[in-house]
């Protein structure tokens, strides 16, 4: 909106559809779908690691979660996470943990359910308080691939008419603010 060059500005529709205006349920759904996209079957794993989206998320991992996202969670939730699988410190596993805790909410310990709350609002609030940049950076990351693939799973979150402007802005800012990371990650 504040870009001096009109070609770099999102149209009003793009601004109105920004995740800041989504309800909590839509935000959680978006993050869960992103996790699903990044956790495709093993035959696709090499392709997923080469996605611009994956590179962008990992390039911004410290901005999203610090050195280890697991340390930002309450100890009861950390314990609950370890019961079902091993999560590493990468952003893909952070998204997977959020997705799994939402999809298997009834299987959580009473303590973990109390921490996360019973509603979509309280659930999202917990994760956004622990990781304030997660939604924004994930949205930027997904825009990079949606621009190219028009993936139907993400069509409720993006519109092709403005996605190329959004993706171009994400790339431009990444190059300007993190040149050492963009070149090292082949971004």
Task: Give the predicted meaning of each segment.
Residues 1-4, 185:
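Short intrinsically disordered, low-complexity coil segments enriched in acidic
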Residues 3-29:
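Terminal C-lobe "cap" of eukaryotic-type protein kinase domains
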Residues 26-187:
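Regulatory extensions appended to serine/threonine kinase catalytic cores
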């Amino acid at each position: 909106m504040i870009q001096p060059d009109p070609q770099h500005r999102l149209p009003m529709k793009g601004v109105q559809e920004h995740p800041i205006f989504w309800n909590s349920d839509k935000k959680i759904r978006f993050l869960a779908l992103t996790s699903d996209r990044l956790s495709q079957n093993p035959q696709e794993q090499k392709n997923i690691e080469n996605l611009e989206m994956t590179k962008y998320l990992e390039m911004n991992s410290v901005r999203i979660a610090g050195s280890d996202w697991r340390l930002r969670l309450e100890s009861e939730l950390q314990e609950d996470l370890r019961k079902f699988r091993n999560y590493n410190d990468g952003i893909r596993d952070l998204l997977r943990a959020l997705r799994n805790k939402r999809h298997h909410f009834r299987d959580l310990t009473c303590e973990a359910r109390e921490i996360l709350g019973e509603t979509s609002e309280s659930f999202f609030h917990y994760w956004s308080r622990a990781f304030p940049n997660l939604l924004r950076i994930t949205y930027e990351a997904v825009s990079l691939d949606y621009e190219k693939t028009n993936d139907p799973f993400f069509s409720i979150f993006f519109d092709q008419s403005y996605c190329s402007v959004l993706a171009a802005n994400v790339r431009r800012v990444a190059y300007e603010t993190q040149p050492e990371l963009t070149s090292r990650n082949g971004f």
